């Protein structure tokens, strides 16, 4: 090999290689492959620089014949091949005159045209693996990397190859020739196998033994060991690589990766149309409770008994009448349904023993409200095979709705504190192991912050209603059962309270599949006058049913009491998830925990106590048109909980789609904020995917509006 090197390379290059090996204490008689590699690398560096000049106008030109009259400056400063002291002197001088950032490792060249240092690599392995080892070693955005291989492949930072095609072809041809010459002498295999990876000086967390073997076994194809894969991942430069791969896949695919800049994203377009309406399964901020404190009546805990007891606390009932009709419904039927509930409750009270459940008489108004006999007749598919024009019935496209202010008000209310405690300390699961002392502490702090939150009331209300409805749907399939909407809580003083929000009457419920629908009519008490925001109550018929005396600063005032009535429906799978709404507590607790973990890892100690007890510190809660909203840690807990609860209450395909698609845009924006220079292709397609989810759902529209606020402030 030594003889081949002396024959094959220019004597000046051989001499420089000898000096370099001597400087590093290596014997070229033994390390002959290393000797050949150094010579090859030097030659590539010189060829890279050859014939490239900068003229008087500062333009880069190629001059192959020496013209003594031309006032030309070499485009590249060659650093490789100088002894270390001299090389660093050159680097320092370049940094001082050009303002370039000083590299940690000695680079090979400096490009006066592009004003950057260049690291040249020549590899006998795959270019991308070697590229990534180089990138991982030098860890500098400023140094440009250009790798050549003996097979004619190359790879460069951001697919920017610096030189023209012809100059690079000269280098590739020379490398190919060296390879053939070596092969003809039987030297190539030994040379190819002798290449070691770039040695970095930093310490690495070593994996040994079984874990190491498992790691090596589970690598993607084409990676021989974990180190190669690590290097590949650490320095992967995706943009040019993805473009190349896509164009190989198909001629039709043309993914031009565009840089994503602060000016690139536009706001998400929200739909126009009438304002969106309330679509939750039960009233939220508008609900009114009839309550009993310290219940101790006979049959306490039996829903029907509790409901009757709560109804007796109110004395302001009056002859009901419709104050806001439902545009598409038969409003007298809603009125008759409420009157029937009152009458049948009265009947129960007149009985000697109150029954545990109450099935309503199947009157015409309830049959209409519950859609009895309205479903089209089901026909077996086999009986229809011969019908030539069999088709699914046409359904209308949903009408586009615009964002309305009521949904933001609902969310704000859900974050507020009530005057009752809705969960006990042990509501969020028990400790499983002694290690969880910190977990217990976090859970207790978190519970204290959210136990009085209105979102927590919604959880308990949702769990109760869904459990009761699913039980009744299975136990009384054919009956129109009356189900009280009840919740339980404690006052701040610790007294127990039972609350009645209204009633549900369920329809026939032969639920075979998870998605089979059970219809129900909900009747809920409220003090909200529906005429203030009629668009919110589009799906409701609202009755005035009584007058309530309320204590106020000026004494007692009488307010009309309303009943919000609507037909609704749900399914087994929706009720199953509704019963598990307590998961929202866990989800938001985990989000808070990750904030504490981040803080703890910075301070290198557990910060749970400080996190919850330092009342003066504020944390980011969310975006609004005013900017980033901040609040106490308790407010953060309650806001995260409210978001999780609303995701459950307003769950829909629109929300699923919006969350998945907008997340992609969010990640790109965050990458831009972190100065990672993200690139995108088909950004228009992503916007389309996001915007096709914005139809009429109030919670999705609100999230889209928040996202726009985030975009505005994130890209300032």
UniProtKB/Swiss-Prot annotation:
Cite the GO molecular-function annotations of the record: endonuclease activity; metal ion binding; RNA binding
In chain numbering, motif Nuclear localization signal 1 (NLS1) lies across 124-139
Q: Does the keyword Phosphoprotein apply?
A: yes
Q: Which positions does the motif Nuclear localization signal 2 (NLS2) occupy? A: 184-247
* PTM comment, free text: Phosphorylated on serines and threonines by host kinases, including human casein kinase II.
Gene3D superfamilies in the cross-refs: Influenza RNA-dependent RNA polymerase subunit PA, endonuclease domain
At which positions is Mn(2+) 2 bound? 80, 108
Q: What is its main location?
A: host cell
**What is the cofactor note?**
Binds 2 manganese ions per subunit.
Coiled-coil residues are: none
List ligand-binding residues for Mn(2+) 1.
41, 108, 119-120
Q: Where in the cell is it found?
A: Host cytoplasm; Host nucleus
* GO BP term (any one): symbiont-mediated suppression of host gene expression
Cofactor(s) demanded: Mn(2+)
Q: Has the keyword Lipoprotein been applied to this entry? A: no
Q: Which InterPro entries match?
A: INFV_PA, PA/PA-X, PA/PA-X_sf
EC number(s) recorded for this UniProt protein:
3.1.-.-
Q: Which GO terms describe its cellular component?
A: host cell cytoplasm; host cell nucleus
Family under the similarity heading: Belongs to the influenza viruses PA family.
The protein's role, per its UniProt record: Plays an essential role in viral RNA transcription and replication by forming the heterotrimeric polymerase complex together with PB1 and PB2 subunits. The complex transcribes viral mRNAs by using a unique mechanism called cap-snatching. It consists in the hijacking and cleavage of host capped pre-mRNAs. These short capped RNAs are then used as primers for viral mRNAs. The PB2 subunit is responsible for the binding of the 5' cap of cellular pre-mRNAs which are subsequently cleaved after 10-13 nucleotides by the PA subunit that carries the endonuclease activity.
Q: What is this protein called?
A: Polymerase acidic protein
Q: Where does this protein come from, organism-wise?
A: Influenza A virus (strain A/Leningrad/134/1957 H2N2)
Chain's gene name: PA
């Amino acid at each position: 090999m030594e003889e081949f090197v002396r024959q094959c390379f220019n004597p000046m290059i051989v001499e420089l290689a000898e000096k370099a090996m001597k400087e590093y204490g290596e014997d070229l008689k033994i390390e002959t492959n290393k000797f050949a590699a150094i010579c090859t690398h030097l030659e590539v560096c010189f060829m890279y620089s050859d014939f490239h000049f900068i003229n008087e106008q500062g333009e880069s030109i190629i001059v192959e014949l020496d013209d003594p009259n031309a006032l030309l400056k070499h485009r590249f400063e060659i650093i490789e091949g100088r002894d270390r002291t001299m090389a660093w002197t050159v680097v320092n001088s370049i940094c001082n005159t050009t303002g370039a950032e000083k590299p940690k490792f000695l680079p090979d060249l400096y490009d006066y045209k592009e004003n950057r240092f260049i690291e040249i690599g020549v590899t006998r392995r795959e270019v991308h693996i070697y590229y990534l080892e180089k990138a991982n070693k030098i860890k500098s955005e400023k140094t440009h990397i250009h790798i050549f291989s003996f097979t004619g492949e190359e790879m460069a930072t951001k697919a920017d190859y610096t030189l023209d095609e012809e100059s690079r072809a000269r280098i590739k041809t020379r490398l190919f020739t060296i390879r053939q010459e070596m092969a003809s002498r039987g030297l190539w295999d030994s040379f190819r196998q002798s290449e070691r990876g770039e040695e970095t000086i930093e310490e690495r967390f070593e994996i040994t033994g079984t874990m190491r073997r498992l790691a090596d076994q589970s690598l993607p194809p084409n990676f021989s060991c974990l180190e190669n894969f690590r290097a590949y991942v650490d320095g992967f430069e995706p943009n040019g690589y993805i473009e190349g791969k896509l164009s190989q896949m198909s001629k039709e695919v043309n993914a031009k990766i565009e840089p994503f800049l602060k000016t690139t994203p536009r706001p998400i377009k929200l739909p126009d149309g009438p304002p969106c309406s309330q679509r939750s399964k039960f009233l939220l901020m508008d609900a009114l409770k009839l309550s009993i404190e310290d219940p101790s009546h006979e049959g306490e805990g039996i829903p029907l008994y509790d409901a009757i007891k709560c109804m007796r606390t109110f004395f302001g009932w009056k002859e009901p009448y419709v104050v806001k009709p439902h545009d598409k419904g038969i409003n007298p039927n809603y009125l008759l349904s409420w009157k029937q509930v009152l009458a049948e409750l009265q009947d129960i009270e007149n009985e000697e023993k109150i029954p545990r459940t109450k099935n309503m008489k199947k009157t015409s108004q309830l049959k209409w409200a519950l859609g009895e006999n309205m479903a089209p007749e089901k026909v077996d598919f086999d009986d229809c095979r011969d019908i030539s024009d069999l088709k699914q019935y046409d359904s209308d496209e949903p009408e586009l709705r615009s964002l309305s202010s009521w949904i933001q008000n609902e969310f704000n209310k859900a974050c507020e504190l009530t005057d009752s405690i809705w969960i006990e300390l042990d509501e969020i699961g028990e400790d499983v192991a002694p290690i969880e002392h910190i977990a217990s502490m976090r859970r207790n702090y978190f519970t204290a912050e959210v136990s009085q939150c209105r979102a927590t009331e919604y959880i308990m209300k949702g769990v109760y209603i869904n459990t009761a409805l699913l039980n009744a749907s299975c136990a009384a399939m054919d009956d129109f059962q009356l189900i009280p909407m009840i919740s339980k809580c404690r006052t701040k003083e610790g007294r127990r309270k039972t609350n009645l929000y209204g009633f549900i009457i369920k329809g026939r419920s032969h639920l075979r599949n998870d998605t089979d629908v059970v219809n129900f009519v909900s009747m809920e008490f409220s003090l909200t006058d529906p005429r203030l925001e009629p668009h919110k109550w589009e799906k409701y018929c609202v009755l005035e049913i009584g007058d309530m005396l309320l204590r106020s600063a000026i004494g007692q005032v009488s307010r009309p009491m309303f009943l919000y009535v609507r037909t609704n429906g749900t399914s087994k799978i929706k009720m199953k998830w509704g019963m598990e709404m307590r998961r929202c507590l866990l989800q938001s607790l985990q989000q808070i925990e990750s904030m504490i973990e981040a803080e703890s890892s910075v301070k290198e100690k557990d910060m749970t106590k400080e996190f919850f007890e330092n009342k003066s510190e504020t944390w980011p809660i969310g975006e609004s048109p005013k900017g980033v909203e901040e609040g106490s840690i308790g407010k953060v807990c309650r806001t995260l909980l409210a978001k999780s609860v609303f995701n459950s209450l307003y769950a829909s395909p629109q929300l699923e789609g919006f969350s998945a698609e907008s997340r992609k845009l969010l990640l790109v924006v965050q990458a831009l904020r972190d100065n990672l220079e993200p690139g995108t292709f088909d950004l228009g397609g992503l916007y389309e995917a996001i915007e096709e989810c914005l139809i009429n759902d109030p919670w999705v529209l609100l999230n889209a509006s928040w996202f726009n606020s985030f975009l505005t402030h994130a890209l300032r």
